[in-house]
Structures are given as C-alpha cells and as structure tokens.
C-alpha cells in the first residue's frame, strides 16, 4: 500500500498551497479566508520514482482560537492513519496558541509518528531569520519553505519520503485476484451486499448510517476466480458534527480506490444519484479504475416495465461524458443481480488489463478514419499516421500525427467512443495521447 503523508496545521498556514505544489496541480481552492478548503483532499503523488498518497486535512477557523472538538477529531484521525506527518506553521505570523495546541498533540499522543516540522511562507531573508525562534514549539529546527514559490520543498519532501518504508515488497495485492472496492454513501447497503455475496453476517449491519467504520477485506471465490471485496465506510455529507467521521470515510474510500481494480459504486434506488455519489465516481475515474454502478434497494421501488430504462436514461444524462459506466439494479436483501454484478465487474477488470496488438489497433484506426475524417482547422487537416498501446495498468493509447494542435474535441470523443465499442471498454477510463510524428 502506498504510504500516506498528512499535511497538518491550523487554517491559513498554506496547507493547500503546499498540497498543490507537491502534486504540481491546482486541485484545491486556495484562498486567504481561513478554512476555505471545504473537502478533505487525498491524492496520489510521485516524487523521484517514489509513490505516495498526500492528504490535506483542511480545517476551518475555530472559535476563540482554540481547537474545536470537530477540528481536533479530524486532525487526530488524519495523524492516526498517516505514515508521516508534515506539521506546518506560518513563519511570518509566528507561533499561535493553536499551533502550540497541535504541537502538544503531536508530541504527547503521536510521539512514535514520523513528524516533520515545517515553517511556510519563508519568502525573504528576514522571515528566515525570525523563523529560527519557532524551535520553542518543542520540535527541532524547522524546514524553511515557501510553498508558493517552491523554495525548500524538494529537500523537505525528499527527507519525508526517505524516512518511509519502501512499499515494494509489502504489497499483498500482487496476485491475480480481482480487487473490488464496495463504495457508497452510508446506509446504501454496502455491508449487506458483501454479506449477501459471502452468505455470512461478517459485518455489523444496522439502519444507522455509518455503522461500518473501517475498510474490511473479504475473499469471494466464484467460477474458479478469486475476488477481494474491500468494504468501506461511506462518504457523508459535510456537517460540523460529522466532520471527523466524514473525513475518515473519505480517506478510507480513497485508499480503497487506490487498491482496487474496479469500484462498485452503490446508489440508493429511492434517492438516485447525489453529489456524494458523483464525488466517489470521479475519485475512481481520476485514478483510472474501472467503475460499475449498482442501483441497490431496487426491491423497495414501485416499478413497471419502463422504470429501469427511465432510471438508466436519467442516470446516463446526469453522468454526461462519463456515461460509459454500466448500471445494474440490485437488491442485497433478496440477492437480486448480486452475482451478476460480480460477473460484470470481472469483465471490466479483465478488459481493463487487455493488451491489443498494434496491427489490430491500426486496422481499427483505418476503419475509423474511413467512417469520419478529422475536421480541418485553420485550413489544415489532422493526419493520424498510426497508433499503438502503451504499457500501463489501464488502457493508454498513443496516436502519432502531423500536428496534435489540430485535434478537435468532437473528433477526440468520436475516437474514444469507437475504441469503447470496438474493444469493450465499458466502465473503463481511457487515456489517449496525441504525439507529433
């Protein structure tokens, strides 16, 4: 499993800026307003060949400059699950009571954790000089960085990663079993589905949302194939009371997605697709995992012969450009379509791993170009000479052409649709790269 690095600190010390700097992206909203990071961000990263998960714990401005119960809980959960912690303070404003509160938690409760003390916003020599006084936090001399400009970040991150055990050799998933993450909001029936498949009450199941707290692995053997079912706590809507649980569930979901081949995303048939469901789906797609939507509790819906088609059509419309995800209607209670879901997930997993010969791909390309020529742009025509598949853990295709700038989005979508139809990539994200040749 990839090591998890948590960014911890009071609001507005630059956690999101450092998060974006390390991942070289602008995925989090960065704003001077304290607590502007609305959701917990957990993303995969890579530095000098070493892979890891990076977590921005976010936070909001507590009242009276003391740690609120919710913020304390989410910070504690972040540290508890992390392999290393980057504790960030603002070098320009110096240590506050809140910084010292967090420092005490780290030193007393998590003294065995790998903790790296970082002074951010060190963007001139005077601030660097004043930052030396931060040792009164109880830690050794801090790393001096500027997340905004990148100064000092590389050296700090290198030390963090060198302190962590190499994940190679520790992975228990290096086998041929198909790994399925059972995902969804609380109370959609995740544990009930796993119980239905295993024929055992392995999990505690109740009507109280969020009964299952951690990811639990189960092994299912079916038709000579072995499946690892990763059952997780669901994603919650954000409330102050549930902030800690919501964060923890989000983390468990992200780590389960990292491990899986296919994400089984359960919806409540009575509620349909909600924003939290879309969040889970996008997390899986961003990580290039296979996705299968299970509309659970279908037995509780009043229906006729047209209900399932109407539901599917509406769902595909909501999904938009990711409407390639298959949909199966299930009932964990009656076991309706539960094993069909496993069989479909197996097909997705196998197709996600398939390697297509270059000759077959170029035969496909010629047939596709005969059906539709790329549109001209500024009087020039895109000419795709040949294509090939790049070795990866998901389908990646390279198209060699005269000028990638001539590619229109409409033609890209047409090519992707043709690829899906020709090679059965339903439920599988595809990466297409257009290279000059």
From Swiss-Prot:
GO biological process: ribosome biogenesis
Gene3D superfamilies: 3.30.300.20, P-loop containing nucleotide triphosphate hydrolases
Binding, GTP 2: 184-191, 231-235, 296-299
This protein's record includes keyword Repeat: yes
Keywords associated with the record: GTP-binding, Nucleotide-binding, Repeat, Ribosome biogenesis
Domain KH-like: start-end pairs: 354-437
Entries under NCBIfam families matching the protein: GTPase_EngA, small_GTP
Subunit organization: Associates with the 50S ribosomal subunit.
Function: GTPase that plays an essential role in the late steps of ribosome biogenesis.
Name of the protein: GTPase Der
Organism in which the protein naturally occurs: Chlorobaculum tepidum (strain ATCC 49652 / DSM 12025 / NBRC 103806 / TLS)
This protein's encoding gene: der
């Amino acid at each position: 499993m990839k090591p998890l690095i948590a960014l911890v600190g009071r609001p507005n010390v630059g956690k999101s800026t450092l998060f974006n700097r390390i991942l070289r992206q602008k995925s989090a909203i960065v704003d001077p307003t304290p607590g502007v990071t609305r959701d917990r961000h957990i993303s995969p990263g890579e530095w000098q060949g070493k892979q890891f998960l990076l977590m921005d714990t976010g936070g909001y401005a507590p009242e009276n400059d003391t740690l609120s119960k919710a913020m304390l809980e989410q910070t504690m959960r972040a540290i508890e699950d992390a392999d290393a912690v980057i504790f960030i303070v603002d070098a320009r404003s110096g240590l506050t009571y809140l910084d010292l509160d967090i420092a005490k938690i780290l030193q007393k409760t998590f003294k065995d954790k790998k903790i790296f003390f970082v002074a951010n916003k060190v963007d001139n020599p005077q601030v660097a000089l004043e930052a030396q006084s931060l040792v009164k936090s109880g830690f050794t001399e801090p790393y001096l960085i500027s997340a905004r400009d990148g100064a000092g970040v590389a050296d700090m991150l290198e030390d963090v990663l060198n302190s962590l055990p190499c994940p190679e050799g520790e992975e228990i998933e290096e086998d041929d079993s198909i790994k399925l993450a059972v995902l969804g909001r609380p109370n959609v029936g995740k544990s009930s589905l796993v119980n239905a498949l295993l024929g055992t009450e392995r999990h505690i199941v109740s009507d109280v949302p969020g009964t299952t707290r951690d990811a639990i692995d189960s092994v299912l053997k079916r038709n000579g194939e072995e499946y690892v079912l990763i059952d997780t706590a669901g994603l919650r809507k954000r409330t102050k009371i549930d902030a800690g649980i919501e964060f923890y569930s989000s983390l468990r979901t992200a780590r389960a997605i990292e491990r899986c081949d296919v994400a089984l995303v359960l919806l409540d048939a009575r509620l349909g697709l909600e924003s939290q469901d879309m969040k889970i789906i996008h997390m899986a797609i961003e990580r290039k995992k296979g996705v299968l939507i299970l509309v659970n509790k279908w037995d509780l819906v009043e229906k006729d012969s047209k209900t399932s088609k109407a539901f599917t059509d509406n769902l595909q419309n909501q999904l938009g450009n990711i409407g390639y995800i298959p949909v199966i209607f299930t009932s964990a209670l009656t076991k309706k379509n539960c094993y069909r879901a496993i069989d479909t997930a197996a097909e997705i997993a196998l197709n996600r791993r398939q390697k297509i010969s270059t000759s077959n791909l170029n035969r496909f390309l010629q047939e596709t170009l005969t059906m539709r020529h790329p549109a001209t742009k500024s009087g020039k025509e895109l000419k795709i000479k040949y294509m090939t598949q790049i070795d990866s853990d998901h389908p990646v295709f390279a198209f060699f052409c005269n000028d990638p700038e001539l590619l229109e989005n409409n033609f890209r979508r047409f090519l992707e649709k043709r690829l899906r139809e020709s090679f059965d990539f339903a439920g599988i994200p595809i990466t297409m790269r257009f290279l000059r040749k």
